[in-house]
């Protein structure tokens, strides 16, 4: 069924969440064993913390950046990167900030929440490598603070990214969700929009999601990497 939809679709949108990353070893902060368990995320990853509790802010993001060192995309990422060249994928909308899609070679990534793999100075805009946090050098030569290029609590999502994601979603005839609990707004609106505009909706996630009743196909309790590899083999058969 899915292979038929993939081959017949004119425009495909992939939507990925934390479940895509966890199979590469990236912690899922929304799970019971997640990154922020026991910590208040709004006290660590917020505009307020950046402005008024900077040491804790820096320590938190240093920990996250260091935790991504050595993490590599699993084979499912490679499948998606290959599909970009073989199938009409218009975008990979992701809730993740880890940059693993780009690392695997994907070129049509729309990171809704920004990227932790980029830093920039809030004063002059100069870009920096993440090594500046690892070596504890969070200030620019101009004196400005260097921050991760992620969307913090208290900030709005990038309007250009949102607009492009919405346009591609409305144009899609197949919308494939991979590893998202679909509980975070406004990201969880995209599958609804796709369905309302006539797309086939496929949800692949370890647990149930609130949008499962809308889906044309739901797959649970399966590794996303394995699912993508098996689907790819079926496409090549």
From Swiss-Prot:
Binding residue positions for Zn(2+): 121, 124, 140, 142
Gene coding for it: cobB
Domain Deacetylase sirtuin-type: 1-237
A single MF term (Gene Ontology): NAD+ binding
Any one of the GO CC terms: cytoplasm
Cofactor(s) needed: Zn(2+)
Details of cofactor binding: Binds 1 zinc ion per subunit.
Residues given in the record as nicotinamide binding sites: 29, 98
Domain of life: Bacteria
Residues the entry annotates as binding NAD(+): 18, 22, 29-30, 95, 98, 113, 180-181, 205, 224
Keyword terms, alphabetized: Cytoplasm, Metal-binding, NAD, Transferase, Zinc
Enzyme class: transferase
This enzyme's EC code(s): 2.3.1.286
Family stated for the protein in its record: Belongs to the sirtuin family. Class U subfamily.
Protein name stated in the entry: NAD-dependent protein deacetylase
Residue numbers annotated as active site: 113
Role according to the record: NAD-dependent protein deacetylase which modulates the activities of several enzymes which are inactive in their acetylated form.
UniProt keyword annotation of Hydrolase present: no
One Pfam family linked to the record: SIR2
Catalyses which reaction(s): N(6)-acetyl-L-lysyl-[protein] + NAD(+) + H2O = 2''-O-acetyl-ADP-D-ribose + nicotinamide + L-lysyl-[protein]
PANTHER family, A to Z: NAD-DEPENDENT PROTEIN DEACYLASE, NAD-DEPENDENT PROTEIN DEACYLASE SIRTUIN-5, MITOCHONDRIAL-RELATED
Location relative to the cell: Cytoplasm
């Amino acid at each position: 069924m899915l292979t038929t939809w993939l081959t017949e679709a004119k425009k495909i949108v992939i939507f990925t969440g934390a479940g895509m990353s966890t199979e590469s070893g990236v912690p899922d902060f929304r799970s019971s064993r997640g990154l922020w368990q026991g910590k208040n995320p709004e006290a660590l990853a917020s505009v307020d913390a950046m402005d008024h509790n900077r040491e804790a802010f820096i320590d938190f993001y240093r920990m996250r950046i260091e935790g991504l060192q050595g993490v590599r995309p699993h084979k499912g990422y490679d499948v998606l990167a290959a599909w970009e060249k073989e199938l009409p994928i218009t975008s990979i909308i992701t809730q993740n900030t880890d940059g693993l899609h780009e690392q695997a070679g994907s070129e049509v990534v729309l990171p809704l929440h920004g990227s932790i793999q980029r830093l920039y100075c809030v004063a002059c805009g100069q870009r920096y490598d993440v090594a500046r946090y690892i070596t504890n050098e969070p200030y620019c030569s101009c004196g400005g603070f260097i921050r991760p290029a992620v969307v913090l609590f208290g900030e709005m999502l990038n309007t250009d990214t949102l607009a492009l994601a919405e346009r591609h979603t409305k144009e899609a005839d197949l919308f494939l969700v991979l590893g998202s609990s679909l509980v975070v707004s406004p990201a969880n609106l995209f599958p609804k929009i796709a369905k309302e505009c006539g797309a086939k909706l496929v949800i692949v996630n370890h647990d149930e999601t609130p949008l499962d009743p809308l889906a044309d196909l739901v797959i649970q309790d399966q590794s996303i990497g394995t699912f993508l590899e098996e689907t790819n083999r079926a496409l090549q058969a």
